Amino acid sequence: MKSDIEIARETDLRKIKEVATTLGIPREEVQNYGRYIAKVPIHLIDKKQMDQHNLILVTAITPTKAGIGKTTVSIGLALGLNKIGKKAVVALREPSLGPCFGMKGGAAGGGYAQVLPMENINLHFTGDFHAVTSAHNMITALLDNYIYQTRNTCEGLKEIKWKRVLDVNDRSLRNIVSGLGGSANGVPTETGFDITPASEIMAILCLATDIEDLKRRVGNILLGYTNEDKPFTVNDLGIAGAITVLLKDALLPNLVQTTENTPAFVHGGPFANIAHGCNSISATQMALTYGDYVITEAGFGADLGAEKFFNIKCRKAGLSPKLTVIVATAQSLKLHGGVPEKEIKEPNIEGLKNGFANLDKHIENMKSFGQQVIVTFNRFATDTDEEIALVAEHCEEKGVGFAMNNVFAEGGEGGTELARLVVDTIENHPSAPLQYTYDLNDPIRTKVQKVAQKIYGASSIVYTTLADKKLRQIESLGISHYPICIAKTQYSFSSDPKAYGVAKDFELKVRDVIINNGAEMIVVVMGEIMRMPGLPKEPQARKIDIVDGMIEGLS
């Protein structure tokens, strides 16, 4: 089979204004970024139209390190729906350069189910990530200047909560000391870098409803505390307007197309293990305004991305999906069934069966939100017919719809079985009204307990001294009503990345609590999860090259 980049280059792309016209977006409203990429103004969102259309969430069982193919399936489902005569749009997150050059590679789908132009999308795209990085680090620079200028006055700060960000995987930047070299170079400070998708600015961009809401949220970002223990925000620096200016264009959703010219909104990019893991509210709402069926995805397994999608994004935006699709693969089931990672591509019926416990827990979790659930099997070349039949049989026993998909190899044609099941389920057995895991008025500890016990299956939770201190600060600030965003490993229900399957009777340790006052959420850090990833021994960057002006090795 041809490589992703070869397939992408052979696709006959339509000019982006033509793609917009197929949706009903006026040509004069489209802001071109070249021939095949555009931004669309937020004022086109129509809440009345949204309510008449169908939102579908694509999530997954606990993934392997190579991923599970959610983005490919999301794109392929949109292609399949269009194949059977439905007006479908897909709404996805933007890829990050860190994983693109790190372990996973790009995030524009794969095979014959991609969003295009994939080279642009996987690399610099419309500059949204650069805008987030610039805005975040501009705050840091202005904050450092304030600290320097007030270092010998009563207006100084004693506790700083704001780091820097870069869109790279670089473990050496996690903990640094800035301001070295004498008094002319600033005040020495222990600090560090997070990756851009973990930036509070990224979360704000994805949750803001318009430019005024964006500015309000930016102004409320908590940067630290004064010598009198008072919170110090971006508004106190007097720079909310300046930072919003840097984000003005990044706020607008990006319109692109798939390998079969299906419209796609690709906007925002928080990770689900260290942030809330969903594309922007504005992109999802734009897609719902113009598409009868809108497919979106949430990062990693359903315990992370989907939980935050429902408890944070849907609650904030008033969204309620008609259906949730859980993606499973033979390789991931075997990994969670006790098969060594290096052997998961080999046939192993017993290991596959043992992995059903992981699938069942995710199904149970999605049903706890009132969701109607179907399972789709993302086929790989190494899968056997017997393995596929066993998964289908298991889903039937559980009373859950099942559909094969082979969209990677066949595009929309390989997604028609799934598309028909999706339409039939929505028409005859749609999801119930959304039920949340916790109430916003619950104390933070209660929220953590409910997610940890109901979604992860934890038996107990302990807090470090630092986390206890942060919880007291939250109470004093009067923001205990914020939703929580748990940061933990994506490879297990527990905080141990090697506890495959369904962990039992385990303790979760809350290491830190981060106040995202602008994003209006509380980030709860569990285990050893890092907000700045590192690179593997063999990074994807070693496969990427440019020959005669053409990019090679990007996938």
Swiss-Prot record:
ATP binds at T64, K65, A66, G67, I68, G69, K70, T71. Keywords: ATP-binding, Ligase, Nucleotide-binding, One-carbon metabolism. GO terms for biological process: tetrahydrofolate interconversion. It catalyses: (6S)-5,6,7,8-tetrahydrofolate + formate + ATP = (6R)-10-formyltetrahydrofolate + ADP + phosphate. Pathway: One-carbon metabolism; tetrahydrofolate interconversion. It comes from the Bacteria. PROSITE patterns: FTHFS_1, FTHFS_2. Its EC number is 6.3.4.3. GO terms for molecular function: ATP binding; formate-tetrahydrofolate ligase activity. It is an enzyme of class 6 (ligase). HAMAP family: FTHFS. Belongs to the formate--tetrahydrofolate ligase family. This is Formate--tetrahydrofolate ligase. It comes from Parabacteroides distasonis (strain ATCC 8503 / DSM 20701 / CIP 104284 / JCM 5825 / NCTC 11152).
